[in-house]
């Protein structure tokens, strides 16, 4: 505090810059993290980066049926949705405490 009860603007600015740096580091860490989603009891598995990029899809041969492609398609979509949910949880865990200190910064779900 400065004389007269006014906040020290340089200290507030330094604190905001530090919080911004921490948030940027957490966002980069999140983008480079990997999560796994699955469907059909693990018959279809998806690996996704925190950025949302799908990096691998593994399909158990037991679920491949040329006469029932729709089931396989549904399982792939389900596994991707599960991985996306895991990214959301990870983002909330890593970014939530930081963004909360900055008023949420308009980040959905935080």
Curated annotation (Swiss-Prot):
One of its GO terms (molecular function) is DNA binding. Keywords: Cytoplasm, DNA-binding. It is found in: Cytoplasm, Nucleoid. One of its GO terms (cellular component) is bacterial nucleoid. Homodimer. Binds to DNA and alters its conformation. May be involved in regulation of gene expression, nucleoid organization and DNA protection. Belongs to the YbaB/EbfC family. This is Nucleoid-associated protein Mkms_4993.
